[in-house]
Amino acid sequence: MAARPARHVLALPECGAPGDGGANARALVLDTNIVLDLLVFADAAMAPVRTLLDAQRLCWVATPPMRDELARVLAYPQIVPRLAFYGLTAGELLESYEAQVRWVDVAPRISAVCKDADDQHFIDLAVAHRAILLSKDKAVLCMQKRLLVLGAQAATAIVFEASGWTGISHRGPVATTSDMQAA
């Protein structure tokens, strides 16, 4: 019996196509902890994000206040030794960040308010750009339905297989394309 598709995976057919030079790339907003997973810790769960960014199927959008928040986090006493362990400096990491993002204006505040005020600017930007917002923050993830109505999606990870992008994962195990076809 084939596995049923996980309810937490959403198909995203509107994603940019390979080889279109990023012209139709889907906007992506990363909260600060996800940025650390991508740029510092090389978290395996971030491999699909890296692949899709490199292929210009996603366009990482950010604002100067998001960069400032990252700079502040990189100075935290618990982060500094981790940077050193990976042979990185805060300056190098910020340069890498700046080279990879598309700078945009701070988005206007939306009607959906996050319980964690520190995360509101990520939500506002995701809605303004009809973006995927990757976050592990429960205050953000509990807003999934409200964000969908506003044209944005919140998730913890992007799912990618050899056959292509299957969707985004909100939590838990991930359904694959073959699981979805068998259901």
Each predicted region: which residue ranges?
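PIN-domain endoribonuclease scaffold, especially VapC-family toxins
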Residues: L52-R109
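Alpha-helix capping/helix-boundary segments
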Residues: I34-V35, M66, A139-V140
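Acidic, PIN/NYN-like endoribonuclease modules and their adjacent C-terminal/linker elements
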Residues: A11, G16, V113, Q120-I123, ...
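Residues at secondary-structure transition points
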Residues: A44, V61, L88, V113, ...
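Short, flexible loop segments at the rims of nucleotide/cofactor-binding pockets, characterized by
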Residues: D37-L39, L83, P108-K115
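Residues that scaffold the ATP/ADP-binding catalytic core of kinase and kinase-like folds
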Residues: D37-L39, V73, R82, M143-Q144, ...
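Divalent-cation
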Residues: A2, E98, D118, A157
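Short, well-structured N-terminal submotif of metal-dependent ribonuclease cores
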Residues: M1-A62
